[in-house]
UniProtKB/Swiss-Prot annotation:
CDD domains: AdoMet_MTases, THUMP_AdoMetMT. PROSITE patterns: THUMP (PS51165), UPF0020 (PS01261). It comes from the Bacteria. It comes from Haemophilus influenzae (strain PittEE). This is Ribosomal RNA large subunit methyltransferase K/L. It is an enzyme of class 2 (transferase). The gene is rlmL. Residues 43-154 form the THUMP domain. NCBIfam families: PRK11783.1. One of its GO terms (cellular component) is cytoplasm. SMART domains: THUMP (SM00981). Keywords: Cytoplasm, Methyltransferase, RNA-binding, rRNA processing, S-adenosyl-L-methionine, Transferase. Pfam families: Methyltrans_SAM, RlmL_1st, THUMP, UPF0020. InterPro entries: 23SrRNA_methyltr_KL, DNA_methylase_N6_adenine_CS, RlmKL-like_Mtase, RlmKL-like_Mtase_CS, RlmL_1st, SAM-dep_methyl-trfase, SAM-dependent_MTases_sf, THUMP_dom. Belongs to the methyltransferase superfamily. RlmKL family.
Length: 711
């Protein structure tokens, strides 16, 4: 009996133990990352040929403790390698693990290689060559602290390489992972299996090979034992011939009941080719189809729906996936009553969009991603969610977040008509109207931006996430916007300058119209879009006040107020902001509106420091500072409540005799220190109600705005 070790992906060890035991393995023992077992020659070859879950099968040669690279070299060079293979073979060393002495796997692999070739030279033999591409012999070294295990890799290439997959779509599953998903899905051999988003077909091919009794390595041409001196050719031929006979025997017994659907006809061609290579093309029916129109191909039977849908690593990039999972859940409940469903995803949040309760779930890794597989039982009663294809859109809306959907629909009717009259492309459609749906929905021309407000700490995180998913689904249905034109953002309470935090780097800009001004927006790269919609009337008012005046825009952001002032006939404009990014944005806004000339200055500076040194006067000043800032580029922190009087003192110095300051901020509960202002010789009138547009009338505290002049 040989002592062997089968490696597998983390989480599949128990499943692998069962599989190996069924194949005849003795004394199977689970450890992290694999299973130790004993086997005679026939069982060894049977596990190599038939295991669908093992990544590699290793034959340990050296097990020892090492405390330096010299110990490593000594252990390897002192081993009798001629008993395993001769000098004419090529070899390669896979080295895994590090410790304090051997800190790099490449260094460890080099020392093992040195030990092997030096051993052969000491025996008077030719140095065996290293082959990184297709070596005759593969040596596997594993180091954990001081514990070293060096094994002969009897697999050769990793066992997930079945040989049938010539090509794949994006993010393909490893075949070993696909086999595990099938085994855990609840699918019963002989029953229908449907993959509605099949990609290159790996799940269906693995399942079909299980039913057809096709050994997963039946088509493998090269093995790690081909040049092994202990290789038992007669035992190997017996095991392989048994597998060939069994596969031929089963071919005539199986009727086609595997179905693969995908929207991409190109990837379906790859799936068909892969199935042909895997010997199961006659068992699987392929069809180009959208999951939104998914039909049950076996209405009078009960089977399993299995799939690995697309998934994103960040929720904020996946509105299209939210819609996909939502409609998938609806089709399952309409078309597959009484069926089992098994879905594998890295984002359990997306699985919540199915709106189904899982009966079982399993954790797994897909490369670096933590994933989950959830099994469901579809109710035997046909869902009323979709009763007629013509009513698909309406019923989707009414099933998912109906209260939110109805409110959004009502707001759209009211606000869209008003926005058209005002010649506005960008406006708010929903602003946390319903407490349970704590988010904002904005339209920017053909795009929709959904901004989630951070949920209070007393709200269950999973419940808040589910409501967000439902709201996104309903928004897509009500607005009819294309999924790639819905942008989802998670917004938290502003801390310092996190409105400047970069979220992406797409660089996708387009302009919107606002009272005759054209303004660039970017919906994806930053927390904000480049245009504060609640200040629309403030900007319009500035345009009306600016004619013939010298205008200062302090804390200017993207300079949209400057554009309105210039279009309103300002004699000059000065735009100051600390961010070079936003100042460049402001410049592009000016160019877009044909605003040019030396009278329009753009200044990158700490606004407070610049103001203290400014020696000219302005007739109209717009200042919209952050609520709080502790930017490293500022010498001191800023708090609008604490510091606004000092700001007004400096602004008074640069304000012309008949000039006006328009001062705004977003601090809720802000209290203007009117007494201190009067002592400065300034008077302030609150005009917040006049600057609140129709689409923000429910949120009266979104900003406060003041008009300040000399007494």
């Amino acid at each position: 009996m040989k002592q062997l070790f089968a490696t597998t992906s983390r989480g599949f060890e128990e499943l692998l133990k069962v599989e190996l035991t069924e194949l005849g393995a003795q004394e199977a023992k689970v450890v992290q990352g694999g299973v130790h077992y004993q086997a005679d020659d026939e069982t060894l070859y049977r596990t190599l040929l038939w295991s669908r879950l093992a990544s590699r099968i290793l034959f340990p040669l050296i097990e020892t403790k090492i405390y330096s690279d010299l110990d490593l070299y000594a252990a390897v060079s002192g081993f009798n390698w001629l008993a395993q293979f001769d000098e004419r073979v090529t070899f390669f060393v896979d080295f895994n693990g590090t410790n304090q002495e051997i800190r790099h796997t490449q260094f460890g692999a080099m020392r093992v290689k040195d030990g092997i070739v030096d051993y052969f030279e000491r025996q008077g033999k030719t140095r065996p060559d290293v082959d990184k591409i297709q070596p005759d012999v593969r040596i596997h070294a594993y180091l954990n602290r001081e514990n070293l295990v060096i094994s002969l890799d009897l697999s050769g290439e990793a066992l997930h390489l079945r040989g049938y997959r010539e090509d794949a779509g994006q993010a393909p599953l490893r075949e070993t992972l696909a086999a595990a998903i099938v085994m855990r899905s609840g699918w019963q051999v002989g029953s229908p299996l449907v993959d509605p988003m099949c990609g290159s077909g790996t799940l269906l091919i693995e399942a079909a090979q299980i039913e057809a009794k096709i050994a997963p390595q039946l088509y493998r041409l090269h093995w790690g034992f081909d040049f092994w001196k202990a290789h038992n050719q007669s035992a190997w031929e017996k095991v392989k011939n048994e597998a060939i006979e069994l596969a031929e025997e089963k071919q005539s017994e199986i009727q086609p009941h595997f179905y693969g659907f995908d929207l991409d006809h190109r990837v379906l061609k790859k799936a068909q080719k892969n199935a042909q290579n895997g010997g199961v093309s006659h068992l699987i029916k392929w069809q180009q189809a959208d999951v939104a129109a998914l039909k049950n191909p076996r209405l009078n039977e009960v089977g399993t729906v299995i799939c690995n849908p697309p998934y994103g690593e960040r929720l904020g990039t996946t509105p299209a996936l939210i819609a996909l999972y939502s409609v998938f859940g609806q089709r399952l409940k309409k078309e597959f009553c009484g069926w089992n469903v098994s879905v594998f995803s890295s984002e359990s949040t997306l699985l919540d969009c199915l709106r189904m309760r899982a009966s079982r779930q399993f954790k797994a890794k897909n490369g670096p991603l933590d994933c989950v597989q959830k099994n469901y039982q579809v109710s035997e009663r046909k869902s009323d969610a979709i009763t007629d294809e013509k009513e698909l859109e309406f019923n989707r809306t009414s099933e998912v977040a109906p209260d939110f959907a109805n409110r959004l629909q009502k707001n759209i009717k009211k606000i869209s008509k008003w926005a058209k009259q005002q010649e506005l492309d960008a406006y708010r459609l929903y602003d946390a109207d319903l407490p349970e749906y704590n988010l904002a929905v904005d339209r920017y021309a053909d795009y929709i931006v959904v901004q989630e407000y951070a949920a209070p700490k007393n709200i269950d995180e999973n419940k808040a996430r589910q409501r967000l998913l439902d709201a996104v689904t309903a928004t897509l249905q009500v607005t009819g916007v294309e999924t790639n034109k819905l942008i989802l953002k998670v917004r938290q309470k502003q801390k310092g300058t996190n409105q400047y935090e970069k979220l992406a780097n797409k660089g996708e800009y387009f302009y919107v119209n606002e009272y005759g001004a054209q303004l660039w927006v970017n919906l994806t790269d930053y927390l904000d879009t480049g245009l504060f919609l609640d200040h629309r009337l403030t900007r319009k008012m500035i345009g009306e006040l600016a004619k013939g005046k010298d205008f200062l825009n302090l804390f200017a952001y993207t300079g949209s107020a400057t554009v309105h002032a210039a279009l309103g006939g300002a004699k000059s404009t000065t735009t100051v902001d600390m961010s070079n990014t936003y100042l460049n944005w402001a410049e592009q806004n000016l160019i877009l509106n044909d605003i040019e000339g030396k009278q329009h200055k753009l200044i990158q500076a700490d606004c407070l420091q610049w103001l203290e040194k400014c020696d000219r006067q302005f007739d109209l000043i717009f200042v919209d500072p952050p609520t709080f800032s502790n930017s490293k580029r500022m010498e001191e922190s800023w708090d609008v409540q604490r510091d606004h009087v000092k700001l007004m003192s400096n602004l008074k110095r640069v304000l012309s005799n008949n000039g006006t300051i328009v001062f705004s901020n977003n601090k809720r509960g802000f209290k203007m220190n009117l007494v201190a202002l009067e002592e400065l010789g300034l008077s302030a009138i609150e005009i917040s109600h006049k600057t609140l547009p129709l689409d923000f009338e429910r949120n009266k505290q979104i900003h406060n705005c003041w008009m300040i002049q000399h007494i």
